[in-house]
């Protein structure tokens, strides 16, 4: 059986026939009644509409900025501590991996893991890369851009994640 995967912006009123929030990255967060019976929300109240952007904004989408002077990655990792995160540079890629062991929360036991990989622009100074985690759970990976004649340095190295006590200055999408 073929199942069409729809982007959340294009959800239709035929909710039971399309994927719901259950398949999104909301692991460990509570379920709503429309997650289990999505057709109820439109039949009980014709004025109720689920936010079209909620699943997109809350799904851990990263933001990558590359301007003339620097390269920056913002990634929401609010469920992870610096000890749970590993940031490595492998040649011209940065790999961010987060994993925490099973722990108890309000809804039972939960464990989380993610892996993201981004290509670094060739003009990024790999010797000056830094990574920090803000108090509100925003991981910021950044590096300055320089003249393109630099040696890339070692083919693999770890970038330590430092903790900041202030909230992130990254714009909320």
Swiss-Prot record:
Entry-annotated residues carrying Phosphoserine: 45
PANTHER family for the chain: ALPHA-CRYSTALLIN A CHAIN, HEAT SHOCK PROTEIN HSP-12.2-RELATED
Gene that this polypeptide is encoded by: CRYAA
Residue ranges, annotated region (Required for complex formation with BFSP1 and BFSP2): 1-63
Family: Belongs to the small heat shock protein (HSP20) family.
Described function: Contributes to the transparency and refractive index of the lens. Acts as a chaperone, preventing aggregation of various proteins under a wide range of stress conditions. Required for the correct formation of lens intermediate filaments as part of a complex composed of BFSP1, BFSP2 and CRYAA.
Protein name per its UniProtKB record: Alpha-crystallin A chain
Residues reported in the UniProt entry to bind Zn(2+) 2: 107
Residue numbers bearing the N6-acetyllysine modification: 70, 99
